[in-house]
């Protein structure tokens, strides 16, 4: 199929990335005053609004880039994830409806229908749209102590047909134009099971010509691998997208890097479970309580890790070989356990005030001695060997 001449204006691939800074996270009073005087018409260029266009124009806004401006020509469908559409401007006759995109594939990969629900926008005239990465959060995760990335930023992917992209994550593709030369397709879930892959199959392949708006966890950066000798090792959760000649070539360029622990870390140490059963045998109340608390904490942390593994898959270190371009995100692309609970944190929460704190005693048993004159004396001892010896000696004297 021949490519229209209108696409000849796009001569190279460009990726717009924005690094968030601390100064822009909290706006000043002057910035807030300026923002209150801005309306939707002033957000876009008036000259561009009057000019007819034949191709879409995507532009990220702000620092960090938490919003994007999309200018769409007439009769070009625009797909936007549900919940990410902020506003529309200049659309006289607009058709908007829900569209299920790759329903069965997303249901198998992510066990959710949310990644499949898109707004499909088509207008008879040019219109402007504002889009933000407003995804619904996981409701079960926070209850289990799981946390998602603190914020998501946008980056623009403009394709000219020279390379394909594999994009990972169920919330990575925010919006894209549905022209005849742009394709956004997930892999076939049944064919993937027939061959092993080094990394997750939860990705979408973007190929052709057009604009795609991506969302990454935290800030998004590019890494350019110049040639076949250039390679990088990256933690799998931070990988957002990889370019290549085609889907198979990208898959073959990614291999798993095995990281073996140091020899001293492989030595076996007594576990908390061992101390737990040891305390039961010795009938040691203090040791039994400490061991039970430690076992409970370890079990809770283990439950959260298992839940995270079921959702996200195992953590891997990936070796990626060039030449290609990578998109790296600073935060995780998945739900991960928050900081694991440890014994020290629990003890600090329940620690007594300094005025009431006492030095820990090495003895575990207290007993009282009543003399013939009625005096009572309390003593502490690790065992009753010495007391039993005194009783035996006093009994021998009476004999």
Swiss-Prot record:
Keyword line:
Mitochondrion, Transit peptide
Keyword Transit peptide belongs to the record: yes
Q: Which InterPro entries match?
A: AIM24 (IPR002838), AIM24_sf (IPR036983), Trp_RNA-bd_attenuator-like_dom (IPR016031)
Give the stretches traversing the membrane.
none
Listed under GO cellular component are: mitochondrial inner membrane
Domain of life, per lineage: Eukaryota
Primary location recorded for the protein, binned into one broad class: mitochondrion
Give any Pfam family that matches.
Answer: AIM24
Where, per UniProt, does this protein localize? Mitochondrion
Q: Residue range of the transit peptide? A: 1-22
GO BP annotations of the record are:
inner mitochondrial membrane organization
Name residues in a coiled coil: none
Under PANTHER family, the record lists: ALTERED INHERITANCE OF MITOCHONDRIA PROTEIN 24, MITOCHONDRIAL (PTHR36959:SF2)
What's the family?
Belongs to the AIM24 family.
Protein name, please?
A: Altered inheritance of mitochondria protein 24, mitochondrial
Source organism of the structure: Zygosaccharomyces rouxii (strain ATCC 2623 / CBS 732 / NBRC 1130 / NCYC 568 / NRRL Y-229)
